[in-house]
C-alpha cells in the first residue's frame, strides 16, 4: 500500500510538471491519462485480469514473446503482488496528477522569478520554494490515497481473488473474505473497527500537518 501510494505521488508530480508545459498533443495525452480515473474499480480489475491471463492476455504474450519472461499471477505470489501494485498505480495516479496540477497552477510566480534572478538552480527552487508551497496538497493527497488504499477490495478480488495464497490479501480483501465466505462476523468487525481507528488517526495527522499550522499563522 505505502509503496503504491508513494509511487503515485512521484509519478503524479512528474506528470503534472510535464502537463504544465506546452507540447504537441497535450490535450489528447491529458485525456488519455485521465481515463483510468473515471473507471469503476471492478472494471479496472476485470480489464487487468484479461490483460494478465496467460492464455489470452496481451501482457503475458508480450513478455513471453519479446523478453522470454513468463507471467502467471495465478501461480507466482511476487508477480501477483507486483501486478496488483502496478494496477493501483495505473488507476489512481491521474488523481494525484490533477491535484498536483491544481496546486502548481495556484502558486504565485514572484518567488520563482526572484529565485531565478538570485541564481538558484532547479533543485534549489524545488526544495526551498515549490515543495514547501505545495506541501498542503501533497499531505491531503497522501492521506486520502492511504485511507482509500486501506479499504481496496473489488479490483483486487477481480484480479487475483486475494491470492495466490495471501500475497494480495490486503486489509480490505482480508475483511471481506472473513465476513462473507467464512461468516466470521466478529473477527471481521474487529478488524473493521481497527481500520476505522487508523483512519481517524490519519485524519488527525492531516489536520496537524495541514490545518493547524495555518491557524497558528493567522493567530
What is the predicted function of each stretch?
Residues 1-219:
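A structural signal for multi-pass alpha-helical bundles of membrane permease subunits
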Amino acid at each position: 500500500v505505502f509503496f503504491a501510494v508513494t509511487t503515485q505521488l512521484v509519478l503524479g508530480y512528474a506528470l503534472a510538471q510535464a502537463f504544465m508545459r506546452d507540447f504537441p498533443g497535450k490535450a489528447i495525452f491529458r485525456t488519455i491519462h485521465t481515463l483510468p480515473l473515471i473507471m469503476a474499480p471492478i472494471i479496472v480489475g476485470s480489464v487487468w485480469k484479461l490483460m494478465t491471463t496467460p492464455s489470452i492476455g496481451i501482457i503475458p504474450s508480450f513478455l513471453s514473446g519479446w523478453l522470454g519472461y513468463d507471467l502467471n499471477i495465478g501461480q507466482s505470489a511476487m508477480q501477483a503482488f507486483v501486478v496488483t501494485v502496478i494496477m493501483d498505480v495505473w488507476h489512481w495516479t491521474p488523481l494525484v496528477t490533477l491535484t498536483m496540477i491544481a496546486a502548481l497552477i495556484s502558486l504565485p510566480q514572484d518567488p520563482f522569478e526572484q529565485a531565478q534572478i538570485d541564481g538558484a538552480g532547479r533543485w534549489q527552487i524545488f526544495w526551498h520554494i515549490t515543495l514547501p508551497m505545495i506541501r498542503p496538497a501533497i499531505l491531503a493527497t497522501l492521506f486520502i490515497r492511504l485511507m482509500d488504499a486501506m479499504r481496496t477490495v473489488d479490483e483486487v478480488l477481480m484480479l487475483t481473488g486475494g491470492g495466490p495464497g495471501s500475497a494480495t490479501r490486503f486489509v480490505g480483501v482480508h475483511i471481506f473474505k472473513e465476513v462473507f465466505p467464512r461468516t466470521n462476523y466478529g473477527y471481521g468487525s474487529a478488524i473493521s473497527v481497527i481500520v476505522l481507528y487508523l483512519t481517524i488517526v490519519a485524519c488527525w495527522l492531516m489536520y496537524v500537518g495541514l490545518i493547524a499550522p495555518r491557524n497558528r499563522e493567522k493567530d
